[in-house]
Amino acid sequence: MTPHVMKRDGCKVPFKSERIKEAILRAAKAAGVDDADYCATVAEVISSQMNARSQVDINEIQTAVENQLMSGPYKQLARAYIEYRHDRDIQREKRGRLNQEIRGLVEQTNSALLNENANKDSKVIPTQRDLLAGIVAKHYARQHLLPRDVVQAHERGDIHYHDLDYSPFFPMFNCMLIDLKGMLTQGFKMGNAEIEPPKSISTATAVTAQIIAQVASHIYGGTTINRIDEVLAPFVTASFNKHRQTAAEWQIPDAEGYARSRTEKECYDAFQSLEYEVNTLHTANGQTPFVTFGFGLGTSWESRLIQASILRNRIAGLGKNRKTAVFPKLVFAIRDGLNHKFGDPNYDIKQLALECASKRMYPDILNYDQVVKVTGSFKTPMGCRSFLGVWENENGEQIHDGRNNLGVISLNLPRIALEAKGDETAFWKLLDERLALARKALMTRIARLEGVKARVAPILYMEGACGVRLKADDDVAEIFKNGRASISLGYIGIHETINALFGGEHLYDSEQLRAKGIAIVERLRQAVDQWKEETGYGFSLYSTPSENLCDRFCRLDTAEFGVVPGVTDKGYYTNSFHLDVEKKVNPYDKIDFEAPYPPLANGGFICYGEYPNIQHNLKALEDVWDYSYQHVPYYGTNTPIDECYECGFTGEFECTSKGFTCPKCGNHDASRVSVTRRVCGYLGSPDARPFNAGKQEEVKRRVKHLGNGQIG
């Protein structure tokens, strides 16, 4: 029986005694030992030891050779063999993937790593430290934690195991809705400080900033505060009462007016401080927190004041140049009878939101009725687009805050279509195989959290961010079961998938092809529904943002299948179900095209439109918002808001494959411009932190959704 040797990279090869003999002879030559018969004898002894086994590790063989040589007459030969083995190990390590990736970081030559995340400034030490940890975490996960077929599928580009630099090496999850209300009203401990309920809005926002930083350092995805205007409203009341008490003490004639005026100023200043805090702090992950504020449904004067303060601060901008703030992402809820139409009590806040969106791109909007229809209840997305389903506690109450997403595995749909070579039957068969593999990968995320104790992340599990107050040695896995947490299957490239399968006509122009695209997503939804039924975990379908993935999958597929027209020829894949960015349509038709997908992929979605400068035509933007209200749950506005600090130009910079340039004076100095683009669901500043090549090309090709002159 010939045993198999398990090599360092995990592959198996047949055992060959000749290789042992050759290695010993090389060591003998280096040691000045001229005894070929002895070398052959040692090789035969080792072979006889190994032949009794079906599988042996390469390190076991080398150790056996060393032991045999050490017991023989030529100690210098044993020493030479050990030194030879050590030198080979060093050379192998230098050539190894781990060493190459570390060198690429240290020497700043690995552009794929350095530009993978547009929110990470890879030039600074804290981020480099995080990237280094990520390289090691990825390597360990691939070598020791994940099933080999999952690793191979990820390496090939069949699937993408998101955030390998954090999970499964660390028992971390993706994104969440912080239970801010519970933390602020019940108090909590952070570090060495016991935090009591705040007594003013300024203190409440200061504490909120610290909570955001702590939570964001313990998870790897987005951090969302759901309905922040309603959560923080009681602290506006507390400030008002303090100011009114001051007015009474000083016998100010109009105590109510004085208190209201001082409260308005305090609230504005509090949210200004919060915005600056978010944009200046760095988490332990080496980046600004991916944080989202959901607001707009509060009806009290305190909630309205918070809504206005958030929007007015965003409009004002950051610093002396009034730069557009990238974070927090703002998501404004619109509800008929509240703020949707003229005459609604909060319609004035909607007008302020329109102005803000035209100048700062945010807020995106949540259309209340559609969100409830598609996801079962109203809530703000976790991060940029991940939505929770309905979950009720033991009292039958719907709970959103404190819940989370455990992670994502995305399918490379265009690759399946390329492998199928135009055969639809083969495509469906391959898709089912990939779905089984994706499920296996997702289950590793769940398994990694089993047995984990609350003490690994006190802010999440012991101090209330996850809506629970566990003890240090309590298991955390229970709070993720029965649909309380979601875990998501992602997908990319419906547009390229249809092109690869059917070619010819554009997806947008064919009702038949549109139906084919929808059918693919329907099959994905059927799969996650089945997994949810079988496991009890909250499997959901997620329309992957694809900041890095649009480039990675396309690059791997180009290497495998070549440049395929309509598929790999652009250098990127289209995000999830989105319309091809080069297709010229009006915003209403784009909404109609994308509207069938969110109800299917209700675990994660967003629709958006590209517009010219509409700061002086807010009615046109409102028309699109109002149209979206009846058709899609979640809508974003992309408008040109770039600024040149050399010549004063405001508008849209020219986007090239190498960067962004002022069209008026040619300035492209990153320190003298402000360039803002929607990366996926979040905004980014590509002038300061460049996109990867695929995302840069996609941004360059985007067209405005104008129609027949209705917009602009």
Over which residues does each language-model region extend?
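Long insertion/accessory domains within large nucleic-acid-processing enzymes
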Residues: 666-712
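Short, hydrophobic beta-strand segments
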Residues: 3, 45-50, 291-292, 496-501, ...
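Charged, amphipathic alpha-helical regulatory modules used
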Residues: 1-109, 696-702
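Conserved catalytic cores of very large enzyme subunits
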Residues: 87, 91, 98-483, 504-505, ...
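Metallocofactor- and cofactor-centric catalytic cores in central/energy metabolism, strongly enriched
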Residues: 28, 271, 275, 500, ...
